[in-house]
């Protein structure tokens, strides 16, 4: 499926938005990168490099930059929405309802619900989610990577696939929108926990145990929400968890490490989705009687109610059980 070199709006000029705009050009298309701040957009257009969020990656000539949202989406079939989750509601409210929406943030709506549900509640009929083990620093440089676009609208998923697939980026489609979206949400919390382990210098055994039990916790939650179990072990589940929990590029892992050292978890103004997600998921689990022990521990530590040591002890002190026990 080809777009014939058409223009693709990329709404959000952070690191991931910038990397996706560059990826669009590698697939043979033009991209319009929208930045909310006019001064920032002007600087990007002039310098051709996002020194604030993705230094070292130059914007190709096929990427235009604007702060005019109407201009950015004019004539487009769909747009990649790449702002942090807290900014998604306001951005969606300003977009035409016949536009296809591809959500690229790995977070939850303000009420703790799914961003795809929020988009549909606002009147968007064509909605998809893009997720996978994709660090902007590597995708922007053209290092090999793979990702998943999921939607109930398979035609839209196919168009997004054609927009991004290239010799350096494998793009798979999926009909499991719930699993792909929520896998990207929950892995951020598990990555925060692995950062706590790193910051406390608890060793490789502890990290391996945390990641493995975290995957189990992810699986229970995703399946309870209607996801396919196979998705848990795909790129948007296990793949994204491995990348986020182990990489030096991971904001969430770095935030957990910073908390363990007694430092502020958000550095350089970059959004750490897992900090907010942990509290929302913990509140949901408590209200619905679900056992998400790692999420609970991270939420308590992130809120300052528990120290990192107390959080780890809460996990190590749980009752004895079978490994496969729910």
From Swiss-Prot:
Pfam families: NAD_Gly3P_dh_C, NAD_Gly3P_dh_N. One of its GO terms (molecular function) is NAD binding. InterPro entries: 6-PGluconate_DH-like_C_sf, 6PGD_dom2, G3P_DH_NAD-dep, G3P_DH_NAD-dep_C, G3P_DH_NAD-dep_N, NAD(P)-bd_dom_sf. The keyword Oxidoreductase applies. The active site is at residue 187. It is an enzyme of class 1 (oxidoreductase). SUPFAM superfamilies: 6-phosphogluconate dehydrogenase C-terminal domain-like, NAD(P)-binding Rossmann-fold domains. It is found in: Cytoplasm. GO terms for cellular component: cytosol. Its main location: cytoplasm. Gene3D superfamilies: N-(1-d-carboxylethyl)-l-norvaline Dehydrogenase, domain 2, NAD(P)-binding Rossmann-like Domain. Sn-glycerol 3-phosphate binds at residues 106, 132, 187, 240, 250-252. Its EC number is 1.1.1.94. It catalyses: sn-glycerol 3-phosphate + NAD(+) = dihydroxyacetone phosphate + NADH + H(+); sn-glycerol 3-phosphate + NADP(+) = dihydroxyacetone phosphate + NADPH + H(+). NADPH binds at residues 16, 36-37, 106, 136, 251, 271, 273. Pathway: Membrane lipid metabolism; glycerophospholipid metabolism. Catalyzes the reduction of the glycolytic intermediate dihydroxyacetone phosphate (DHAP) to sn-glycerol 3-phosphate (G3P), the key precursor for phospholipid synthesis. Belongs to the NAD-dependent glycerol-3-phosphate dehydrogenase family. This is Glycerol-3-phosphate dehydrogenase [NAD(P)+]. It comes from Deinococcus geothermalis (strain DSM 11300 / CIP 105573 / AG-3a).
